[in-house]
Amino acid sequence: MRKTILTAALLCAFLGTQAQEYYEKHVAFPAGATTEQKIDMASRLVPTPQQLAWQQMEFTCFLHFGINTFTGREWGDGKEDPAIFNPTELDCEQWVRALKEGGFKMAIITAKHHDGFCLWPTRTTKHSVASSPWKNGKGDVVQELRKACDKYGLKFGVYLSPWDRNAECYGQGEAYNKFFIEQLTELLTNYGEVHEVWFDGANGEGPNGKKQEYDWDAILKTIRRLQPKAVTAIMGDDVRWVGNEGGLGRTTEWSATALMPNSYPGSDEVYKRLGINAMSKDLGSRELVSKASDLFWYPSEVDVSIRPGWFYHAEQDNQVRSLANLVNIYYRSVGCNSVLLLNIPPDKRGLMHENDVKRIKELTEYIKKTFADNKVEKGNRIWTAKVGDTKEYKVRKNTLVNTFLIQEDITKGQRVEGFTVEVFANGAWHHVGEGTTV
């Protein structure tokens, strides 16, 4: 007989039947709170309904597509001629079919990258598809993707770069904020339900650049008003950047974190006081919680490209990540308490390249084969554990197991700090694995 035993270490032992107070998205510790009091409150910090729905998606797709697709650049300078944008075979349904078959839950399009070129016929600038020969200036990539997502049942998100190298008003404070919010408003009112709004933190500000103070309060309020079910990512306050673009989450990845959203006033002071930033290894340990005055439910998103570049480059057609590499990324992202945002850039034709489509099919087949057959009896039942508890599960006879999946009910907060897995075989228990956060 083979059995599996799971031992869990939890943030607090107060998991009985008594009523508990939960803190949604943010908790401020009272003055003089002890470490144990902070840990107890941390264990009752929970996601908003929007954050919960987002975390349950697990696997989403980035679509870097725009004027850079035709210039061969990664960062455009805003001086591009819109006449070069002409994806004569553009087929958003081809994109979305591939994503649906690949197990993706959402597609996020770069509606405007740093070059300022807009993939929809905006009223704010001439640097858009309306000035291109594609469909005689009557095309709308955002709308076509929106319709394809509706048809095939994928959620829809938009990337809108705050940094704009084309807009003349960039760097003029309120003038640009008004311009940016007008673009945002167009995207959030003309394209149905939007599930994620992605704000890149990249910019070229410095000695030779323009300094723009973004009105994040007004920007986030606009989203809450127009798309209340959407999460805001990176420079938003619902979803944080994992801290690298290599596809690797932390082995200990906290959703309940001392990292204040960067768009909040005073965030720089908090980072300095705690000695942390988005790339820090530790964002939620007991030691860090003891020093913090606030905690935020701020889960991690791992963004990585299937190719060396974010935009399509023909010379990279044979440099698509291997299946083994993508499997490792999957385990190091989804398997490390993060949502995986895998970039698959459409090519100049307006199609997903055959090599990319082939590879994502291989990945989804691997994932399905790995997790389709649950070999543990009653393994999908919820177990409410206390500190140090163990639980035994029977594994079906004559089966081999090489992957162990454990999940946590985060509607009650993030409480698991550590777990071990042992297997009973040949008359003895054998340690086969261990981990920290789930």
Predicted regions span which residues?
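Mature catalytic domains of secreted/periplasmic carbohydrate-active enzymes
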Residues: Q20-T437
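Bacterial Sec-dependent N-terminal signal peptides
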Residues: M1-E21
